[in-house]
Amino acid sequence: MFSNTFRKALLIAATVAMPSLASAGQPFDAKAFQVSQAAGKSILVDVTAPWCPTCKQQRPIVEEIEKEHPDLVVYDVDFDTAKDALRQFRVQHKSTLIVFKGAKEVARSTGETDPAPLRSLVAKAF
């Protein structure tokens, strides 16, 4: 049996560690994506893989952009497991970012790690 003090300490430690485990956006869900499109939202689809060095470079930039644009909906597509989504978006490479304004794709980039072009890419949805 764990004491309440130990449980509280464990909870605090887990909470402190969470930001390092957090990722931008939310896992891709086709239905939620369609709802966002129908609502005319600005959307960023981030095709990523946990082992991808370019994706790791993009991650903090995407997180910053997400903070700068609170109305931006970000969906993470796992390159290794989300094969249906990869076909849907015609994606062949990880580290691909796709920007939508509602149902219309307005921009796409693969492998870009410079913050300025990525910000310009997302700005096309606003």
Would you name each region that the model predicts?
Residues G40-I43, V47-W51, H93:
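Short pre-active-site segment immediately N-terminal to redox-active cysteine/selenocysteine motifs
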Residues T54-E68:
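Typically the conserved alpha-helix immediately C-terminal to a functionally engaged Cys/Sec
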Residues G25-S42, K83:
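A short beta-strand-turn-helix
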Residues F89-I98:
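Structural micro-motif
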Residues V99-F126:
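Non-catalytic, surface beta->alpha helical segment in thiol-disulfide oxidoreductase systems
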Residues V47, E66, P70-D84:
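Thiol-based oxidoreductase modules, predominantly thioredoxin-like and allied folds used
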Residues M1-G25:
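N-terminal targeting signals for export/organelle localization
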